Amino acid sequence: MAKGQFPVEKLQQIETPFYYYDAELLRETLRSINAEAQKHEGFVVHFAVKANANPRVLRIIREAGLGADCVSGGEIEASVKAGFPSTKIVYAGVGKADWEINLGLDNDIFCFNVESIPELEVINELAAARGKTARVAFRLNPNVGAHTHANITTGLAENKFGIAMRDMLSVIGEAEKLSNVKFVGLHFHIGSQILDMGDFEALCNRVNELQDELDRHRIRVEHINVGGGLGVDYAHPNRVPIPDFKAYFDTYARHLRLRPGQTLHFELGRAVVAQCGSLITRTLYIKKGSVKQFCIVDAGFTDLIRPALYQAYHKIENITSDEPTEAYDVVGPICESTDVFAKQIDLNRCHRGDLLAIRSAGAYGEIMASQYNCRQLPHGYMSDEI
């Protein structure tokens, strides 16, 4: 959404800070995902609910036909409430509590992505108590390093996620000994905010090697889940509002060798929702320091933690001013020195009351908000509802 396309008069009437979602851009993004994925037989797309669990956002995504990728019992509950069919819900996570596993069993979800033998044994025990058989896939750690921030790299041997590749056959053997789990797939996830298709190609090569090994042992799996990880252009949200899903899906179609009848599952989060969301915040004060000036706004890292947590860049725009630009540090009210959205960025001259839009905030924004300093959680509003 370009700067001039924000409904400023309507936004001025809403108490800040809040999240504003462009419903049409979200739908356009989903249409692009479906158009490109459907070119390839057996491609199945799930939305990574951890990126955004706003109820209206989830409903729009469910209406587009995507499944849900969940990493907690709460996300399973949110997905069920939003109307996702249980047959399209997958549940991953390195530390699944008993009640969360039981929730998945009670809802007959598509698959548990299992990360250890002890977890597998607990799932088997809980499934037996309910007289059910749980479908499980094993999350393998492919030791593929993604070119992204260290805090969102998940596919290296040093990370807490997944089972070592060398243990693949032994964990499959353990599953075959248990009567209330059914081994159906392999799961991978190498990281997030990946823009280099070479990283996904490297994952494909590793998956091909593992499948070849399974073939040698006459082991067949129903599906391969390669996770998500596709990034977005935070620097140019207006120029590149929709990621290159064609290049993404084509990479897997060219380089990953599926067996006959296998399905290939994806778990896209950021790429689906990041660009449709903006954090709208109001300017409280312009403070002139000895060497710089500060634009102090009413949003803080309690509302959008990515800049403080990951040193992440978000484009910021003054959507109520067309005056000449000046350099500002944009900072929030939280009692921490890390409560900074940007340093020395050029904005149209800011005044008290001006609205700023912190762009590309639809993923890992509202969902990661906290009440530190006893602050209220921000609300979310859809463009077609205000």
State what each model feature region is.
Residues A48, R135-N141, H187-H189, N225-G227, ...:
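Short beta-strand segments
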Residues D22-L25, T29, I33, A53, ...:
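General structural feature for long, well-ordered alpha-helical segments within catalytic domains
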Residues H46, R135, H223, T263, ...:
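Hydrophobic "anchor" residues on beta-strands that sit immediately upstream
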Residues K39-E41, A128-G131, R216-H217, P237-V240, ...:
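Short, glycine- and charge-enriched coil/turn segments that flank and shape catalytic ligand pockets
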Residues L25, N52, E75, K96, ...:
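Short, glycine-/Ser/Thr-/acidic-enriched flexible segments
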Residues N143-Y285, L347, N373:
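Active-site loop/helix belt of alpha/beta enzymes
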